[in-house]
Amino acid sequence: MNQFRLKEIYIDGVPSESHLIQKEVTYMLSRKEVFEVHLNKKGRISFLYETQDGMEQYKIKLSMPEKKLSFQWFAWDGSSYVRMNTQNWLTKQIFFRFLKSTYFFKGKKQKMFLAEGKMKTKDKNRG
């Protein structure tokens, strides 16, 4: 089976290296599948995963204002990436990896987790 990795995190459709941030603040921290992302409540974020051979890409989009989570699958056809059918995406291995990873959102020190198919955040200050 082909391995995949988190290639990029996009905020509001802009790649992280293009996103204007303060130099003192860590934008994305990766250590053993733990990612720290600085995002406000109005933000939209996309996680782009890619297989090791570069033949497939998976995009998981999270919209905080709409409280929506969506999934897109792309396959390389020799000249470009083509969007594939994404039925039953909740059972795909990439989605399980996304769920197993931990994402911390700065601001109110919220940790994002998914439960019952909906995005939830837990305020660490409230317990």
From Swiss-Prot:
Location (main, coarse): membrane
Membrane topology note: Peripheral membrane protein
Keywords associated with the record: Cell membrane, Membrane
Record organism: Bacillus subtilis (strain 168)
UniProt key word Membrane: yes
Cellular-component GO terms for this entry: plasma membrane
Induction: Only expressed during growth in minimal medium.
Subunit structure, interactors included: Interacts with both the D1 and D2 domains of dynamin-like protein DynA.
Lineage of producing organism: Bacteria, Bacillati, Bacillota, Bacilli, Bacillales
Identification of the protein by name: Protein YwpG
Subcellular location: Cell membrane
